[in-house]
């Protein structure tokens, strides 16, 4: 998957290629649909991109986009997602998503990390509050799961709003895992 500016006046578009460098499907021309994504395989065995949609009709929602044809499935019903990770290779079928936006227009997830089921059921496991006010890129939480999906690590200044410093690493363990 190549992501970038493929046409004048546009940014954050994606094009999928096979291993021989041949295009697969059409250019994903909508801005950031998805953005801040990670790649994985879903419950049907399809290669997908999982991330936040930065365009309508699913603005702010977590979506998955099938690489072979660009089909989109909305995975969450609310919030404005940020970073997504599917590095939980031993817990397939889930994406770990950081919600760092805390405005009144984006409930129900404010400044927290969640696990989102990839099957379209809109099942979300709430994991932890981030306590991570975003002051610049280095203070973004960017939560990432362990390979078994039982723990999540993220960056946080734990509420130091003015400077966002110092930034430390925090780990949460998922209950019952």
Please annotate each region the language model reported.
Residues 8-18, 56-65, 103-115, 160-173:
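Structural motif
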Residues 1-8, 47-52, 95-99, 151-155:
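Residue position within the beta-strands of beta-propeller blades
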Residues 1-44, 147:
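Catalytic cores of extracellular degradative/oxidative enzymes
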Residues 46-132:
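Loop/turn-rich, solvent-exposed surfaces of beta-rich toroidal or solenoidal domains
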Residues 137-177:
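Blade-level signature of beta-propeller repeat domains, shared across WD40, Kelch, NHL, RCC1
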Residues 29-45, 78-90, 137-142:
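Repeated scaffold domains used in trafficking and secretory/extracellular systems
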Residues 42-43, 56, 88-89, 107, ...:
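Residue-level signal for WD-repeat beta-propeller blades
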Residues 26, 126-129, 154:
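Residue-level detector of high-confidence beta-strand sites
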């Amino acid at each position: 998957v190549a992501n970038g500016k493929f046409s004048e006046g546009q940014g954050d578009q994606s094009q999928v290629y096979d291993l021989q460098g041949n295009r697969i499907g059409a250019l994903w021309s909508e801005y950031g649909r998805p953005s801040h994504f990670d790649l994985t395989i879903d419950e049907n065995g399809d290669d997908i991109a999982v991330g936040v949609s930065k365009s309508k009709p699913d603005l702010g929602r977590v979506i998955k986009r099938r690489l072979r044809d660009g089909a989109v499935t909305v995975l969450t019903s609310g919030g404005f997602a940020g970073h997504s990770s599917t590095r939980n290779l031993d817990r397939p079928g889930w994406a770990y998503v950081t919600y760092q936006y805390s405005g009144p227009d984006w409930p129900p997830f404010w400044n927290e990390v969640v696990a989102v089921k990839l099957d379209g059921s809109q099942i979300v496991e709430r994991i932890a509050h981030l306590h991570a006010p975003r002051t610049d890129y280095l203070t973004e939480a960017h939560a990432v799961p362990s390979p078994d999906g039982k723990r999540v690590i993220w960056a946080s200044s734990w509420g130091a709003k003015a400077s966002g410093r110092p930034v430390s690493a925090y780990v949460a363990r998922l209950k019952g895992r």
